[in-house]
Amino acid sequence: MARSAPLDETNSGAAKAPAISREQYRDAMARLGAAVTIVTTDGPGGRAGFTASAVCSVTDSPPTLLVCLNKSSSAAHAVHANGVVCVNTLAAGHEALSNLFGGRTPPEERFAAGQWHTSATGAPILVGAVVAFDCRIVKTVEVGTHDVLFCEVVGLAEGGGREGLIYFSRRYHAVAGTPEG
């Protein structure tokens, strides 16, 4: 079996690597399946929401997740002004709602397409979400075109064992609900 040569300690091999184009990177990322979420907020900055698949757990002590928010998103001002979000994990059948929140649809039309109730932080929770994480934003880090929001989870709303929704290869796919046992 062939072995690859280790990089030297100066990491000079990295400097010789060819640049990866934006298109190559996006094509590769399309092969990384991810849960589809709608991130919502409400408060002094207004009611807003956006579709996100760049969401993941950071730690369970304290429970924290991260959300990547495009700085040019129509929801960016409201999210930062309110300081709270609810990460609603979508179920199979929520594809149209995901598309509304992922496009240029006005906020009032986005929210009119779903049923919502209010979380403890004031952020909207989607009725029928697989699970919703009610959060307060504790830190924001700017990286390129996005803000990475570190969100402390202050509440959960579980919607049961419905099929989840993932985005993979530029298409939606349903995944089985929670296993028993």
From Swiss-Prot:
Secretion signal span: none
Gene Ontology MF: a single term: riboflavin reductase (NADPH) activity
Catalyzed reactions per annotation: FMNH2 + NAD(+) = FMN + NADH + 2 H(+)
EC code(s) of this entry: 1.5.1.42
Keywords on record: Flavoprotein, FMN, NAD, Oxidoreductase
Function: Catalyzes the reduction of FMN to FMNH2 which is used to reduce pyrimidine by RutA via the Rut pathway.
Family of the protein in this entry: Belongs to the non-flavoprotein flavin reductase family. RutF subfamily.
Name of protein: FMN reductase (NADH) RutF
Classification lineage: Bacteria, Pseudomonadati, Pseudomonadota, Alphaproteobacteria, Hyphomicrobiales
